[in-house]
């Protein structure tokens, strides 16, 4: 194929795949290096964070406050919240770290953001699967009731993480101070993300307010898949899908608008 020739859709997909793969490899090597366990930190890092939280709940014997398995409760809330929080935090620095690569005509601003979010989602997903499998094997938690429903919830929240990453990156690109304080703001959002409570346990007025937050629907859905009908959940798949698509569209438009002013260095 000569330079300037029109590519087919299949060729464009192949090119896009190579671009994403190259950016992923560069990001992994840059972030984790080639020594010691290298890219294994991709999922060891979120796994360790979750491990410390689970052990804390285990040894304070949180089960005595509820008939619910509190380790399972933590495992079905905290890792998912950390996925979208970490993804949005990492998205902020994606452009500055890859400015020199934007000279290549096949590398776009959107690619750099997508790569970072994809890494965070992949790491969180692997850590979640491995840790839950280990906890089931050693008998600390029961096997999930509906794995497919849990996978659906995880996928929808991964989409939310990508959409949020686009929006946060775009806002931080326009206002530097926002990029510096988002880490703190996102940490403040954790208590209201549904990671540490069931909507059913809230007062009715608080329930109606909480259900306007997309991440609460994702957490409720994930927990419904794990606990089954033993718990009462209030998720709306339709609301979560519409919210994801709306946020994704908003994020794509915002990134497209500010990308025009990005100059490679």
From Swiss-Prot:
Membrane topology: Multi-pass membrane protein
A GO molecular function held by the record: ABC-type transporter activity
A single GO BP: polysaccharide transport
InterPro entries: ABC2_TM, ABC2_TM_bact-type, ABC_2_transport
UniProt entry keywords in alphabetical sequence: Capsule biogenesis/degradation, Cell inner membrane, Cell membrane, Membrane, Polysaccharide transport, Sugar transport, Transmembrane, Transmembrane helix, Transport
ABC transmembrane type-2 domain sequence ranges: 37-258
Primary subcellular site in the record, as a coarse category: membrane
One GO location term (cellular component): ATP-binding cassette (ABC) transporter complex
Highest taxon in the source lineage: Bacteria
Transmembrane segments: 37-57, 64-84, 121-141, 148-168, 178-198, 235-255
Family: Belongs to the ABC-2 integral membrane protein family.
Protein name per the record: Capsule polysaccharide export inner-membrane protein BexB
